[in-house]
Amino acid sequence: MSDDQQYNQDKLSQDFQNTSIGSGEQQQQSYQQYQQQPQQNNFNANSAPTFTPSGQQGGYQGGYQGGYQGGYQNYSQGGYQNYNQGYQNYNQGYQGYQNNNRGGYNNYNNRGGYNNYNNYNQQDQQPVQNQGMSLADFQKQQNAQANLNKPKKTLKLASSSGIKLANAKKAPETESKEATPAATEKEATPAATEKEATPAATEKEATPAATEKETTPAPAKKEATPASVKSESKPASKSTSKVATKESTPVTSDKVIQEQVDEVDEEVVKDMFGGKDHVSIIFMGHVDAGKSTMGGNILYLTGSVDKRTVDKYEREAKDAGRQGWYLSWVMDTNKEERSDGKTIEVGKAYFETEKRRYTILDAPGHKMYVSEMIGGASQADVGILVISARKGEYETGFEKGGQTREHALLAKTQGVNKIIVVVNKMDDPTVGWAEDRYKDCITKLGTFLKGIGYAKDDIIFMPVSGYTGAGIKDRVNPKDCPWYSGPSLLEFLDNMKTMQRHINGPFMLPISGKMKDMGTIIEGKIESGHIKKGGNLLLMPNKASIEVVAIFNETEQECDAAFCGEQVRLKIKGVEEEDLAPGYVLTSPLKPIKTITRFEAQIAIVELKSILSNGFSCVMHLHTAIEEVTFIELKHKLEKGTNRKSKKPPAFAKKGMKVIAILETNESVCAETYADYPQLGRFTLRDQGTTIAIGKITKVL
């Protein structure tokens, strides 16, 4: 470093006159001229009042090196473009300034490498302040900078790291983590400092935050500066530390952070609902078994429906000559259902106990409405099979043509793996809580349920009276029923093992219903993943992008998020209501559900009058979708007991056989393999009003 270089105020104006604005080459020469000079911040005791020794901030040096040198570094590190960009901005600003255009003048003030030239002018006009720095401190700083310069031609390193070090010294508490090691190791490890400093330096010229930093006063000034200047320096250092951190973070980490944000801890869900998980239960059984009455009584006993409403229904039922039906009217809401005393649609209701939240799906028991029942069963976690103990009614429901057997089979096919058999109407005069009648009912049904695949542990029997409420919330009175000491229905449901939920799986919601109400609203059960308000989804098989505008839970209340296993209504944007159909699936755009027309499946034929061969067509119920399907090829017959595949393809299939076949649908249908998502990979085949087969998708073709 040459000792004869001193700060000269007049020299500054000469420098800027000599600097050409018109030619990039001349500008570069000018840069080189200053690059050859190791540094411009020699100490002179006489110029202490107006000289800032750090050489990086404020005054002539800050203006000159912060602007020129900072710009030059960007030119050499980031390539010619960065340099050119700053240069053009300056050029535009300069022209604007010449034309006395105020807007252009602002640009001149705010952009390019010449920021600090203005800063110099402003400083010049301000009253001179006393700025002191001890000789020892200054020499320490000079030594550090000399060390950085020693073996390398890294004038740019000294300049950029100097800025960083100055700031680190001034306000360590606001500095980023990277800057702190740079400050502590500045003398010992120049290489480390270089690493730390580079990310910040690369962005210096482009970022207003960094430019701001260059104009802030140096540490020496801090002791004697008024509060106003001090307050200016803090935000600058804060914003600069942000720049440094942002630059040094790898791009991929953004994705990781996003994934972590999207992940939902099960504990969070517990906190949100007070530790209560959600269970969907479906009431199934033959017509007139008492499903709706029992559902209505549960709502009344749990306080979901108040006494006034029930009293009102009782009066209305009495007036209509249907006195005993008033509890079922809580579930059956339309006139046709009330006048005929039978459910047509799948009724939905919600109740809550101390331990869990429940959605009741009240399935129609009539033969004509089996497809509605299948749609309901596909959304349920637990099945409640209601059978009537009344003489004649049980037999009608259980015999061929009755819905008790078919509902139990359909529930199993749709993934309802736990079934509670509720023997209802035990208080009827023809029964009178008789143990013999109860045993008679459960023996035949138990054998049938085991035959269709229910494990012994997954079947529970209990006697109740849906009308009086005995055995529903409280246990049955021992005086009436001394032979049964098991739990009541709600007691059992509350203490049942918790369901497994894929809260962090890819989002999938098969649409079970749609409506128009100030926008498009769809409803269904979330089979996998979770959704937040404002989230983006994909509608399959349309491949339409959807935005979730609002989420409504079981109680019709708006909420911010919904999770796997919940019954929800979503208000969506991006598709019209007429373009939706039950069976469409809202899915995650990152891992969408598959859309298929041809697949391989394992099929068990449960009821078939004739035989089935290639070309046979029937109706397939898959989650909430209903689609016509054709047998393209029967590939293998499976042996009973061992499930061994036959080498030759069978010519036909008949009742009781298990086969592997290739099926084809007319339209694209959303599905997954049974192994990946059981709820979206199992199906039922129906023909002429009866369930002929059940199956699971083994391969998508």
From Swiss-Prot:
Residues 170-224 have a biased composition (Basic and acidic residues). Residues 285-292 are annotated as: G1. The keyword ATP-binding does not apply. Residues 132-271 are annotated as: Charged. One of its GO terms (molecular function) is translation release factor activity. The modification Phosphothreonine is found at residue 359. It comes from the Eukaryota. Coiled coil: none annotated. Residues 20-131 are annotated as: Several sort of repeats. Residues 1-63, 91-124, 164-259 are annotated as: Disordered. GTP binds at residues 285-292, 362-366, 424-427. GO terms for cellular component: cytosol; translation release factor complex. Residues 276-501 form the tr-type G domain. Belongs to the TRAFAC class translation factor GTPase superfamily. Classic translation factor GTPase family. ERF3 subfamily. Involved in translation termination. Stimulates the activity of ERF1. Binds guanine nucleotides. This is Eukaryotic peptide chain release factor GTP-binding subunit. It comes from Debaryomyces hansenii (strain ATCC 36239 / CBS 767 / BCRC 21394 / JCM 1990 / NBRC 0083 / IGC 2968) (Yeast). The lineage of its organism: Eukaryota, Fungi, Dikarya, Ascomycota, Saccharomycotina.
